[in-house]
Amino acid sequence: QLNYSPDW
């Protein structure tokens, strides 16, 4: 599973 979650 590849999930991109930015911290901005």
Swiss-Prot record:
One GO term of the biological process aspect: flight behavior
Tryptophan amide sites (modified residues): 8
Residues with the Pyrrolidone carboxylic acid modification: 1
Any one cellular-component term (Gene Ontology): extracellular region
GO molecular function: hormone activity
Highest taxon listed in the record's lineage: Eukaryota
Localization terms from the record: Secreted
Function: This hormone, released from cells in the corpora cardiaca, causes release of diglycerides from the fat body and stimulation of muscles to use these diglycerides as an energy source during energy-demanding processes.
Protein name (Swiss-Prot/TrEMBL): Adipokinetic hormone
